[in-house]
């Protein structure tokens, strides 16, 4: 699986970061797990991916080779299937919840559907819910309330389908309810814009036709 992520974003540093800053960021990421609900297995894989990135970026020769690849147009990182969920988690943590949600949703669908009751199913379901919520927050910050609602609704549907995490589902439902007034205003403003555009178009036609 290739994810739209680079090693600097993965570990949470700028491309100009020193080795000391990278190691400090690495330790902070290890000490702070994103959510207590993830399984030990996926958290271990996450730690391994962070460690591999820290090792690469603190080795001068390996870092130079990687930076050359990026300069030559290399984009994204490849993750083995057994580390896919940890990779998706790191994508979400890097500030890309929309991309993380879409890819996680896909991983829950055939032919990739995880085995019922497996740790993979549990981790993907939790990640789908958390990333849908963060994606909705991003859309709301941009005043795209309908898009925010869509992310929340999809997150809720996934939790309903999986029959898991009723408390988290209730949180998403509360977030969706809180969005309702903003969605109404959003739809009304769109309708008003459509009316204005229609009026402007009709007025232009009248002028052209001598009306």
Label every model-predicted segment.
Residues 33, 111-112, 159, 166:
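Alpha-helical junction/boundary sensor with strong preference for TPR arrays
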Residues 1-38, 49, 53-56, 63-72, ...:
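N-terminal J-domain/J-like co-chaperone modules of DnaJ/Hsp40 proteins
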């Amino acid at each position: 699986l290739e994810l739209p992520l680079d090693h600097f974003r993965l570990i949470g540093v700028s491309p100009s970061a020193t080795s000391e800053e990278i190691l400090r960021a690495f330790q902070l990421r290890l000490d702070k797990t994103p959510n207590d609900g993830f399984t030990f297995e996926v958290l271990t894989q996450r730690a391994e991916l962070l460690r591999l990135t820290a090792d690469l970026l603190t080795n001068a020769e390996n870092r130079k080779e990687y930076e050359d690849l990026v300069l030559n147009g290399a984009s994204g990182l490849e993750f083995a299937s057994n580390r896919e969920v940890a990779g998706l988690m790191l994508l979400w943590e890097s500030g890309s919840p929309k991309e993380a949600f879409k890819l996680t949703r896909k991983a829950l669908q055939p032919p990739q559907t995880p085995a019922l009751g497996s740790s993979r199913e549990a981790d993907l379901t939790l990640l789908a819910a958390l990333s849908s919520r963060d994606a909705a927050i991003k859309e709301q910050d941009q005043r795209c309330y309908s898009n925010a609602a869509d992310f929340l609704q999809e997150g809720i549907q996934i939790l309903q389908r999986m029959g898991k995490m009723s408390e988290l589902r209730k949180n998403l439902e509360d977030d969706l309810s809180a969005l309702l007034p903003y969605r109404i205003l959003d739809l009304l403003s769109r309708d008003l814009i459509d009316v204005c555009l229609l009026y402007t178009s009709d007025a232009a036609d009248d002028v052209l036709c001598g009306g």
